[in-house]
From Swiss-Prot:
It holds the Pfam family Uteroglobin. Disulfide bonds: none annotated. Prostatein is composed of three different peptides called C1, C2 and C3. These form covalent C1:C3 (F) and C2:C3 (S) heterodimers whose non-covalent association forms tetrameric (C1:C3/C3:C2) prostatein molecules. The lineage of its organism: Eukaryota, Metazoa, Chordata, Craniata, Vertebrata. Belongs to the secretoglobin family. Lipophilin subfamily. GO terms for biological process: androgen receptor signaling pathway. The gene is Scgb2a1. GO terms for molecular function: steroid binding. Part of prostatein which is the major secretory glycoprotein of ventral prostate gland. Steroid-binding protein; can bind non-polar steroids, cholesterol and a group of small proline-rich peptides. This is Secretoglobin family 2A member 1. Expressed at very low level in ventral prostate. Residues 1-18 form the signal peptide.
Amino acid sequence: MKLVFLFLLVTIPICCYASGSGCSILDEVIRGTINSTVTLHDYMKLVKPYVHDHFTANAVKQFKQCFLDQTNKTVENVGVMTEAIFNSESCQQPS
């Protein structure tokens, strides 16, 4: 599960700023992914503009389900890790 999330972060082209990724759409999707109160149905509505076939839809459902199956502590740690990445020295907005 943690490896899957790492691969997701590696494949996303990230333009980082001091708070969040710098892309409100990406931030919203990440928040929806790690928020255990967002149901699978609501999550699919959130990502619908970016899912163009049933193969991708199935992968996205499985990905969200991985987060729904995790403990609150694990999901909280993913949020901390995401913020640490976005706020890291190598991800700072140029002055």
